[in-house]
Every structure is written in C-alpha cells, then in structure tokens.
C-alpha cells in the first residue's frame, strides 16, 4: 500500500463525515456546515448522504474545475453507486436518461441536437421578446398591486413563457408543467418523484404526437421532424430531452430571479450601485450567480478509475459531488468570498458547471436575468420585501435553492 493510498483509506473511513446536503438559513449565505467544509485545507472531504453512504465533496475551486473536466468521473445516474443526494433521484434512474446524465460520446451526440438554439447569436436575438414578456408580467402586477407574490406572479411565469416559446410548448399548459416540475424537483420521497415524472412524460408524449402532425417552429418540433423521423433519437429519448429542457428552462431562472431580488434588497449599497450605473448589470448577474449558486448539488459524479487530486485518492466506484456553492466561495479565487460585490469580476464562477456538461442554457439564463433585473427595478423602483427576510421559507438543501413564495410590496 502506497503512502497516498494508506492516507486516503484512513481518511475516508475514520474522519468525520457530516450529513450532506445541508439547508440554508439565509438565502445568500452558505449553510454553516458548508462554510466549515470550505475552510478545511483539503480539496476533498467525506460526507454522509441520506442513505448512509459516504461520498467526497470537493471544497476548492481549482480542484473542482479539474475534476469536472476529468473523463474518469462519470455522470451516469443509472450507475448503482452514483451519489444520490435525495430519494427523488430514483425518478432519474428509470426510463431513458436525459443527456445531463450521460457520458461522451452519447452525451455529445444528444447535446448537439439542441445546441443550435442556445448559441450566443440566437439568444441575443431573443432580447426583444424577453423584454416584452417581462414588461407584460410587470404590467399585470402593477394593475393588481400594490402587493404581490413575486414568485407566482413574475419570477415563475417569465421564464416559463420564454422557454415555452423556444421549445414550442403551449404556454396555456403552464399551470400543469409548473406543478409537475415543482413536484419532481422538490419531492421528498422516491414515489412522489416517480409519480411526477410519469405525469410529465405522459404530457410530453401527447405533445410530441401533436407535433408530429403540426411541428411548428419550436425546438421540439424540429427534433420531431428531423431527429425523431430520421431515427437519430427514439421517442423515449426525445421525451427525456424535452423534460430536461422544460424543467431546467424555467425552474432555475425562476429561483435565481427570486433570490436575486431578495439579495439586492438586503444589500442596499449594491442595489444602489446598480441603479446608478446600469452598465454594471451583466457583471452583477455573474456575481449573483456566484453567490446564490442555486443548483449547488448538481455536480454529482462517480469515479470509473482511481484519481489522485492534491495528494488525496478517489477510488474507482466512489461518489464525488462538486458543490459549486462551496467552490464559488474559495478565498484563493474570490477575495472576501462571502461578500456580495457587483463590481467584482466573477465570470469564472462554477454555477453553470464546467467541462462538457457546462449548462446548455447559460446564455439564455444570463439574458433573462439581465433583462429582469434592469426592467423590474426601473418599473418598480420602490419594490421591497413585504416580510422580514428571516420569515421567508427557504427550500431545503436537497433541491434547487429558492423560495416558493416571495411577498413584495411597493
């Protein structure tokens, strides 16, 4: 046994392994348990998952980048030892996996079918439509005001309508898919998650049937007309791709919108800087993405071979979780990492991941957030929380970070 192997074996089996994931008590700060992990000198720390198994959590930014780009770490969620952070992962181990849970070359083949819709040029051309949608929902809020639930009346419907237009999904069905999505990503047990996925798949199967006769101009219609008809993708694979794009296309931006509003309102100096200089908005979006890191449990991997990282050993078959909320607070990369600073250059955060699995929709998310944060505060400059931030109910650490309700007034 080498010195490194002996150290790694002893470390993994005998060291304290705190429960993971942990819940936030503040929308824009790390859980205390994560701060402790971040402040440890080692790049890897063992944690205990809900089912009692252990996995490695990556605590350093540079190590996280290296591991996310390492082909010896697999994203295969069907692997028996994949580090599931919640019972709801059972829903992703049934049926055809989405490409987020695939490895090259299959991952690249499926991703390339959709990537043309998410290029910088294509997304830039969507700005007028996004602005129109944002203004429309603000008009509705103002007409019904002077109070609102920002989640249900703005943060959720804006990205829902945007992704519906992009995919060719009828927005008239938004109440169904928003509910099914919430039940899927916030399920606390396996049966609830599987039931939500089944409901979603039945809906998408019916939608694909309609698109086969009337494909329209959306991305799903194009996939039906070309990839499905040509046999490049089967029906189950198309359904799983559609589910991924629809859920990720509205859930994440909705959560980022709500938490960004909370965070700016709780940091009046940073909010004032943005109001005084709108050119800061793109950089502020990157800083908010860094600080909020809403998908901070999305970086699960399984080692297919032994990997040495900074003198520590990940053995083949061990789970690894790159928690971007921790990596984004690495003080060797970001000075004063727990401080929100809209003047900071934060573009190298890991909130969209890194490597071949880097978020497909990041250009769209950036556009939506830039428009939302500009237009919302221009139209409602007196916007404020209707309850103290301490009274907001935060989602648990097992799901996309956010709030399900956000009372505001003006």
Swiss-Prot record:
For this protein, the Enzyme Commission number is 1.14.-.-
Pfam families to which the protein is assigned, alphabetical: p450
Q: Which GO terms describe its molecular function?
A: heme binding; iron ion binding; monooxygenase activity; oxidoreductase activity, acting on paired donors, with incorporation or reduction of molecular oxygen
What InterPro entries does its record include?
Cyt_P450, Cyt_P450_B, Cyt_P450_CS, Cyt_P450_sf
Keyword field: Heme, Iron, Metal-binding, Monooxygenase, Oxidoreductase
Q: What does this protein do?
A: Catalyzes the hydroxylation of sodium ML-236B carboxylate to pravastatin.
- What's the protein called, per UniProt? Cytochrome P450 105A3
């Amino acid at each position: 046994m080498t010195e490194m192997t002996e150290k790694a074996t002893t470390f993994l089996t005998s060291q304290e392994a705190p429960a993971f994931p942990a819940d936030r008590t503040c929308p824009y700060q790390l859980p205390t348990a994560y701060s402790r992990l971040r402040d440890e000198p080692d790049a890897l720390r063992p944690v205990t998952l809900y089912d009692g198994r252990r996995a490695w959590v990556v605590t350093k930014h540079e190590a996280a980048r290296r591991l996310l780009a390492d082909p010896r770490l697999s994203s295969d969620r069907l692997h028996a030892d994949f580090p599931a952070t919640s019972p709801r992962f059972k829903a992703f181990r049934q049926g055809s996996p989405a490409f987020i849970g695939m490895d090259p070359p299959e991952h690249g083949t499926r991703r390339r079918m959709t990537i043309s819709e998410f290029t910088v040029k294509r997304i830039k051309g969507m700005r007028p439509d996004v602005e129109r949608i944002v203004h429309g929902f603000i008009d509705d809020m103002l007409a019904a005001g002077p109070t609102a639930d920002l989640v249900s009346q703005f943060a959720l419907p804006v990205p829902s309508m945007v992704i519906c237009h992009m995919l060719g999904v009828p927005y008239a069905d938004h109440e169904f898919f928003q509910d099914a999505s919430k039940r899927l990503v916030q399920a606390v047990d396996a049966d609830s998650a599987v039931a939500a996925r089944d409901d979603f798949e039945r809906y998408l199967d019916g939608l694909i049937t309609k698109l086969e006769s009337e494909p329209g101009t959306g991305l799903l219609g194009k996939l039906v007309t070309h990839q499905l008809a040509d046999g490049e993708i089967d029906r189950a694979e198309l359904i799983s791709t559609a589910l991924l794009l629809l859920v990720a296309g509205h859930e994440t931006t909705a959560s980022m919108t709500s938490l960004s509003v909370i965070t700016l309102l709780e940091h009046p100096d940073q909010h004032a800087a943005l109001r005084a200089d709108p050119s800061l908005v793109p950089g502020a979006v990157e800083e908010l993405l860094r600080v909020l890191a809403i998908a901070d449990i999305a970086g699960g991997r399984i080692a297919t071979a032994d990997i040495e990282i900074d003198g520590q050993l990940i053995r083949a078959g061990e789970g690894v979780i790159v928690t971007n909320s921790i990596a984004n607070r690495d003080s060797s990369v970001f000075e004063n990492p727990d401080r929100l600073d809209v003047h900071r250059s934060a573009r190298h955060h890991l909130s969209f991941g890194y490597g071949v699995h880097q978020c497909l929709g990041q250009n769209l998310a950036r556009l939506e957030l830039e428009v939302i944060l500009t237009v919302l505060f221009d139209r409602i400059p007196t916007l404020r929380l209707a309850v103290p931030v301490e009274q907001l109910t935060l989602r648990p650490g097992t799901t996309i970070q956010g709030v399900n309700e956000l009372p505001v007034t003006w």
